[in-house]
Amino acid sequence: MKKYAYILLILASVSTMATAQIKIGNYSFKDGSEYTGELKGRKPNGKGKTVFKNGDIYEGQYVKGKREGDGTYTFHDGEKYVGQWYQDQQHGNGTFYFMNNNRYEGMWYTDYQQGEGTMYYYNGDIYVGNWSQDQRSGKGTYTWKAGAQYVGEWKNDKKNGEGA
């Protein structure tokens, strides 16, 4: 019985130490942006919200003061990114909602549409395929609203070759 009581005491101590490191508070970034949320030490770490000086808002995960994990960034002009972050950059799987009502769903790498992704254009057209630094690049299929398609290679955001 004493053995179990001792184990419970150790577990309670470890649990208290772990939660004592994370607290809720505010943090001011050097650029004047204001953060409210979980802090570890004096830096954002965990869930929180930052209101940037220009009116942009980020709500999501932080690690050691940087956006990392899942989060939503709403730009002051109405555009929005919902997805994964790494080292303060859009990185991983995410969706970007453009002001002109286009929507990109797919992979991101250091703030660029990179890898497999789909662009839904405001006029009903759809592109499914590879992206490189925000441009259609490699294999992809563009389908016009009326049903016609181009299936083939892309380079510098333009059809490259005959395609099908």
Stretch-by-stretch model annotation:
Residues Y4-V14:
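Sec-dependent N-terminal signal peptides
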Residues E34-P44, I57-E68, K80-H91, R103-Q114, ...:
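Conserved anchor residues at repeat-unit boundaries in beta-strand-based tandem repeats, strongest
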Residues K49-V51, T72, T95, T118, ...:
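Extracellular beta-strand solenoid repeats
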